[in-house]
Amino acid sequence: MQAKILRIATRKSPLAICQACYVCNKLKHYHPHIQTELIPIITTGDTSLHTVSKTNKIKKGAFIKELEYALIEHRADIAVHSMKDVTVLLPKELIIPVLCKRHDPRDAFVSIQYPNIHSLPTGSIIGTSSLRRQCQIRAQRSDLILHDLRGNINTRIKKLHQGQYNAIILAVAGLTRLKLTKYIQTYIDPSELLPAMGQGVIAIECRINDINTISLLSPLYHKETSLCIKSERAVTTYLESYCRLPIASYAEIQNNQIWLRALIGLPDGSIIIRTEGIASLDKAEELGLNLAKDLLIQFKKNTHFDINSIK
């Protein structure tokens, strides 16, 4: 009898394929006889990369929806995602049983001439489509010009070398996985540019009733990463239910406690509200929810901005 092949749904981008291969290799380490097959899929997010307008951002979940359909329709057994792309609510048929060990969560400053954000001359152009990054950069350097930057990582670097930007901001994890760290000028500390929820984390999704696959994936489960994401995700789940503003949340485990930092701000960087807290590991989700509530209260106190207008 022929062994079952584990079918892995993935986006077609080089980074997504790289992440899927990482999962394949990890599975083969724990299950040497396993057979795998990649199922590359073009997602709504991929087709929108070159057509979306500046005012109409790519919606959360656009990079995973078609992969989830493949799972629900039994065209794939697992799907590999960047955790930061995963929606707050999953389809009722699906579950994320495994978060792999977190890679470097930081953002990278990439430039040909300049070593860091602070060295850029007034009027320099930075490329990033992330509201989170734009907000925090504008708060530090309101004299810089920020333009949207889309495409896969190699395309973005090519645009930098073509002179369309003086610098671009990319995730360290993606550059590392693609062996492109030679382009990094500065690894930006989270205190300067707080990462997105789930940045640097690979998530594996499957059908909720597929007990055999869930068991097969279990060696890849990383407890510390999962606790951090539970805390970070509580922040974004709460705040995204109220508005679509720049949000960041990043948790670390230190001395057997969870340390969570979070922020919310206006896209122009004129207002950023920050908070942080420490809790025992069993209170990770509660910590995230409490900080999110505090952020929203402080944001309303410090601005007359109608958060409901950005739903």
From Swiss-Prot:
Cofactors that this protein relies on: dipyrromethane
EC number: 2.5.1.61
Keywords: Porphyrin biosynthesis, Transferase
A Pfam family the protein falls into: Porphobil_deam
Domain of life: Bacteria
Further comment found in the protein's record: The porphobilinogen subunits are added to the dipyrromethane group.
Name this protein carries in UniProt: Porphobilinogen deaminase
Protein source organism: Blochmanniella floridana
Lineage: Bacteria, Pseudomonadati, Pseudomonadota, Gammaproteobacteria, Enterobacterales
